[in-house]
A protein has these predicted regions:
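Long, contiguous binding/interaction regions
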Residues: 1-89
Length: 89
């Protein structure tokens, strides 16, 4: 992830294997740890084994980057993409 600075708003898209032991709890715990920057999330069942999560974020770029890195670091997470825009004038 490139350097993300300042106040940002954006979306994280994540694809993961919901059958991976302990992963759902881990991902929920991470999201609770970052509830100050997570505005909303949407969960979709893509197949029997794969899920898509869309997470809306707003906050300091370094916090958003840390959240993405934590989500990416777990076995069973197949893809994490981040798109942000500066909210500063």
């Amino acid at each position: 992830i490139s350097e993300i600075k300042g106040e940002r708003q954006g979306v994280i898209t994540m694809i993961y294997d919901h059958g991976q032991r302990g992963l759902l709890t881990t991902l929920a715990d991470i999201q609770h740890d970052f509830m100050s920057i997570i505005q909303a999330s949407l969960h979709s069942h893509v197949t029997h084994d794969r899920c898509l999560e869309v997470i809306l974020v707003r906050g300091d770029g370094s916090q958003i980057k840390t959240l993405v890195e934590q989500l990416m670091s777990h076995k069973g997470v197949e893809s994490v993409k981040l798109t942000t825009i500066s909210v500063q004038d």
